[in-house]
Amino acid sequence: MPSSISWGLLLLAGLSCLVAGSLAEDAQETGASKHDQEHPASHRIAPNLAEFALSLYRVLAHESNTTNIFFSPVSIAMALASLSLGTKADTHTQIMEGLGFNLTETAESDIHQGFQHLLQTLNKPNSQLQLTTGNGLFIDHNLKLLDKFLQDVKNLYHSEAFSTDFTNTEEAKKQINTYVEKGTQGKIVDLVKDLNRDSVLALVNYIFFKGKWEKPFEVDHTKEEDFHVDQVTTVRVPMMNRMGMFEVHYCSTLASWVLQMDYLGNATAIFLLPDEGKLQHLEDTITKEILAKFLKNRESSSVNLHFPKLNISGTMDLKPVLTRLGITNVFSYKADLSGITEDDPLRVSQALHKAVLTIDERGTEAAGATFLEMMPMSLPPEVKFDKPFLVVIIEHSTKSPLFVGKVVNPTLH
């Protein structure tokens, strides 16, 4: 029996953090700012990551319209891109095209340099926004990896390599889960539930995000209110409330209210609240170009905002999802991973991803700032996120979509 590669993907959006944001702005746009020109590598792949994020979201939304969705396009793409370093022929082409890259238009070296710069930027220390990523390579002690693959994943993706005895499945599982738990500060536990004894390699990626609102909510203003899951289901949720100046507007193209909220640091959250019966229209119509415009054209207005506290997670088996995007060979006996090892043929037997999202009044930590705003005398309009909505988050310096999700029921954890 051919050996198999066991591949786990992990994402965490940190506790007490608001997750959402806008997808990547086209890096090739004319009139790019000086800031854009200073970060060409990650900006070149940003539009592709944005397209990949929306494609992946639509596959997940098509499979179920009754469950919460939450994932990190960056985390999944990073794991696939690093894996591609060891793939050849159709297996390689499928991964690159599934990620939204056309190798006749973009040099593969530029793609990997883009991910390398993305990693370096995301892992830079920031006193206001905590954002860290990590890549782990767990290698069976009997497996001989090709030096080029090992050096490439270490140099380009900063992967840490660990010797693992996969014949002792419990110990191997513990080793991988401990790495993940430590990297996500205890927020993701037991990512890997089962390991195949034939596994010889595990590729793990995680991302941890923790931030504070630039404009926090008052805890005393949070009250129990109704959230309408669908036409027949209503649940009670703690609803945060704040009257003030927000970057909120109505988008007729999407038939949705659009709310943008900044974190202290370098990230922005975008929430999209569709009109009654317009959720599928929003999902079908939204594009990276539309989201990029939201980031550019930001105007504040006075509103009475109601927003639910959240603590949701998304766990998925990526194999059927990626298969829908045309990435099939790597999971089958057609897999060509001969760039990883010259030993027995490999295939991907497991592809796991988990994400956690928590939203509360102040962000990750209590915020001590006080905000005084000038308000008009007239009563501001009310915007109430009391039915299913979409959420996206972007990291500004890389223009990368860190997280994408849909909140259907805030009470489902």
From Swiss-Prot:
Task: List the GO terms this entry assigns under cellular component, sorted alphabetically.
Answer: extracellular space
Give the matching CDD domains. serpinA1_A1AT
User: Cross-referenced Gene3D superfamilies, in alphabetical order?
Assistant: Alpha-1-antitrypsin, domain 1 (2.30.39.10), Antithrombin, subunit I, domain 2 (3.30.497.10), Serpins superfamily (2.10.310.10)
Q: Where does this protein reside within or beyond the cell?
A: Secreted
Q: Which domain of life is it from?
A: Eukaryota
Q: Name one Pfam family in it.
A: Serpin
Which GO terms of the molecular function aspect are on file? serine-type endopeptidase inhibitor activity
Glyco sites are at: N65, N102, N266
The record's keywords, sorted A to Z, are:
Glycoprotein, Protease inhibitor, Secreted, Serine protease inhibitor, Signal
Q: Which InterPro entries match?
A: Serpin_CS, Serpin_dom, Serpin_fam, Serpin_sf, Serpin_sf_1, Serpin_sf_2
* UniProt keyword Signal, yes or no: yes
Check the UniProt entry and state the signal peptide residues, or none.
Answer: 1-24
Q: What does this protein do?
A: Inhibitor of serine proteases. Its primary target is elastase, but it also has a moderate affinity for plasmin and thrombin.
Written domain comment of the UniProt record:
The reactive center loop (RCL) extends out from the body of the protein and directs binding to the target protease. The protease cleaves the serpin at the reactive site within the RCL, establishing a covalent linkage between the serpin reactive site and the active site of the protease. The resulting inactive serpin-protease complex is highly stable.
Q: Which family does it belong to?
A: Belongs to the serpin family.
What is the official name of this protein in its record?
Alpha-1-antitrypsin-like protein GS55-MS
